[in-house]
């Protein structure tokens, strides 16, 4: 999982070696990235396409059309340019995930209001609710709303719903 995210967000051999910790050299980490790109060429094509779009337009776009601009995408300074490229790769993915959770929050509100339940917080891709003990009547409808808030074509969005007396003890 770490390798999937790391490659998708443009990690270098140096960066991956640091993430993997002791026992992995920069060369070994770079070889892992190379093997990953050879095994999953569509991922490399996708990320390369995002960078090309950012270079051509100066921005990337989420699935809902929000733009993020990258003024340093053509910077003469290599470090600044590569940072902008990594941001450009990240923006459509993270931005679309943010769009998805915000849409879910909006769409789940009528369900919550119908029962007097409260949404306590949103953390990355999680929503946390306070509900009466023993009342799980809206758990499945909320899960379904979250799975369908923003469809990704043929790619299923899977949502786990957990209930517990506190955040630590969710099951």
Please identify what each model-predicted range represents.
Residues 1-171:
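Conserved catalytic core of nucleotide polymerization and phosphodiester-bond processing enzymes
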């Amino acid at each position: 999982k770490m390798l999937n995210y790391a490659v998708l967000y443009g990690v270098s051999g140096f960066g991956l070696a640091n993430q993997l910790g002791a026992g992995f050299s920069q060369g070994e980490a770079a070889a892992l990235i190379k093997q990953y790109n050879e095994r999953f060429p569509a991922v490399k094509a996708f990320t390369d396409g995002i960078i090309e779009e950012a270079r051509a337009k100066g921005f990337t776009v989420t699935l809902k059309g929000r733009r993020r601009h990258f003024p340093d995408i053509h910077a003469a300074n290599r470090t600044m340019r590569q940072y902008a490229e990594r941001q450009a790769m990240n923006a459509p993915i993270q931005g679309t995930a943010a769009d998805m959770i915000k849409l879910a929050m909006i769409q789940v509100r009528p369900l919550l209001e119908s029962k007097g339940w409260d949404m306590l917080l949103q953390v990355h891709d999680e929503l946390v609710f306070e509900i009466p003990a023993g009342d799980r009547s809206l758990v499945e409808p909320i899960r379904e709303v979250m799975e369908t808030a923003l469809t990704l074509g043929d790619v299923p969005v899977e949502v786990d719903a957990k209930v517990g007396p506190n955040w630590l003890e969710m099951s």
